[in-house]
């Protein structure tokens, strides 16, 4: 049996639908937020990655959105609550960093929730400026040069 692998997730595929459900459960539902049609339509131009603990069990996801030819924004990083604290998020981020570098990007930017900021600092992301409010909670703009 195949265990613990990361793969690209094609937009509008069954795996993408599963990724959306996981992102909603971890990131949106606790804040009472829904996805808009416009937000989901924009995702067709983004790059999605999934961490599967088995061939049919998605436990972590993240999305990368090109800002320009040099910068890509990491978004919607989510790991199922029952699978957190096992290195899945770190593996996803490292995979995305390798992907970004191979794709020719020179820098990754992200908006980290207050609670996630130490996680990104451990992965050598740096804070830019002061904290700000996004979707009703404190965030930090962060970046990493590849």
Predicted regions located by residue number:
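Anionic, Ser/Thr-rich low-complexity intrinsically disordered regions
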Residues: 2-123, 128-145
């Amino acid at each position: 049996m195949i265990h613990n692998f990361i793969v690209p997730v094609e937009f509008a595929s069954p795996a993408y639908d599963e990724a959306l459900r996981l992102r909603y459960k971890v990131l949106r539902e606790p804040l009472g937020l829904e996805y808009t049609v416009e937000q989901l339509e924009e995702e067709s131009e983004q790059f999605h990655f999934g961490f599967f603990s088995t061939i049919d069990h998605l436990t972590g996801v993240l999305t990368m959105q090109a800002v320009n030819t040099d910068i890509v924004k990491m978004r919607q990083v989510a790991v199922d609550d029952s699978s957190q604290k096992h290195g899945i998020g770190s593996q996803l981020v490292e995979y995305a960093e390798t992907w970004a570098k191979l794709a020719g990007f020179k820098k990754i930017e992200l908006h980290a929730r207050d609670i996630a900021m130490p996680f990104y600092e451990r992965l050598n992301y740096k804070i830019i400026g002061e904290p700000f409010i996004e979707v009703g909670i404190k965030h930090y703009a962060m970046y990493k040069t590849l």
